[in-house]
Amino acid sequence: MGQNWKRQQKLWNVPQLPFIRVPPSIYDTSLLKALNQGQQRYFYSIMRIYNSRPQWEALQTRYIHSLQHQQLLGYITQREALSYALVLRDSTKRASAKVAPQRTIPRKTSAMTRRCPSVLPVSVVLPRAQSKRRQVLRN
């Protein structure tokens, strides 16, 4: 009986790998369709490692907790805390919905672009141009 108990204890100490469950929504992706179940689990585990969404969510909650703490200490008002939280929520919505736009306008060659901006503002008219106009008007 004692030997059997020792064997069971040895089996308990063996580290077990966590079971990776691939969600059904991921099964239909083109990357995982041709793979068998073990390959799908392995690939999904890699996808989870490189997913930045949990880090973003943790950063957002940390920022919200920081806002609440500053409000409790009296550094900011409740209205300010709510406005900051709304800005955070709206910016994350825009960032998640943003798709890289396609560039349709061809870039100019380096010879066509200005290397240094003009020193004069746009509204300044050169005196020589004004004097030429006056000469044309006088004739």
Swiss-Prot record:
It holds the Pfam family FAM216B. InterPro entries: FAM216. It comes from the Eukaryota. Signal peptide: none annotated. Belongs to the FAM216 family. This is Protein FAM216B. The gene is FAM216B.
